[in-house]
Amino acid sequence: MNPAHLLILAAVCVSSLGASSNRPMPLNLYQFKNMIQCTVPSRSWWDFADYGCYCGRGGSGTPVDDLDRCCQVHDNCYNEAEKISGCWPYFKTYSYECSQGTLTCKGGNNACAAAVCDCDRLAAICFAGAPYNNNNYNIDLKARCQ
């Protein structure tokens, strides 16, 4: 097995351990979680981990609402970042700042880190401006996301 693939497999396995919201996760996802908590402090980041057709695992079909559309755009943004040589968005850390609900990506990030930071920053801002519909949490993906 390719060492890079083995590293990814190990990271995914480690990130899936645990049974609570304190489970380990790749560092970038930890940073994204913190960005979400910066812009939407009234909700748990976990509320966004299994929402609609695009927030969380997978992503297909038509977004169910504006919040789900934020996740679709975020997925597409990560796909674009992956085109940067050696850029793995789910594992790339970056420098940013949260101050009173405002997110800023720091200037010292390399091209990949800057792209991923901006993807996460824009998604967190989008989440803050989109209504949350409890009926779109943990939906039946096969029935609603074709």
UniProtKB/Swiss-Prot annotation:
GO molecular function: calcium ion binding; calcium-dependent phospholipase A2 activity; phospholipid binding
Protein family membership: Belongs to the phospholipase A2 family. Group I subfamily. D49 sub-subfamily.
Residue sites binding Ca(2+) per the record: 54, 56, 58, 75
GO cellular component terms attached to this protein's record: extracellular region
Cofactor note text: Binds 1 Ca(2+) ion.
SMART domains: PA2c
Cofactor(s) the record lists: Ca(2+)
CDD domains attached to this UniProt entry: PLA2c
Tissue-specific expression: Expressed by the venom gland.
Role: PLA2 catalyzes the calcium-dependent hydrolysis of the 2-acyl groups in 3-sn-phosphoglycerides.
GO biological process, one term: phospholipid metabolic process
Protein known as: Acidic phospholipase A2 2
Annotated localization: Secreted
Keyword entries, A-Z: Calcium, Disulfide bond, Hydrolase, Lipid degradation, Lipid metabolism, Metal-binding, Secreted, Signal
EC category name: hydrolase
Pro-peptide positions on chain: 22-27
Active-site positions on this chain: 74, 120
Catalytic activity field: a 1,2-diacyl-sn-glycero-3-phosphocholine + H2O = a 1-acyl-sn-glycero-3-phosphocholine + a fatty acid + H(+)
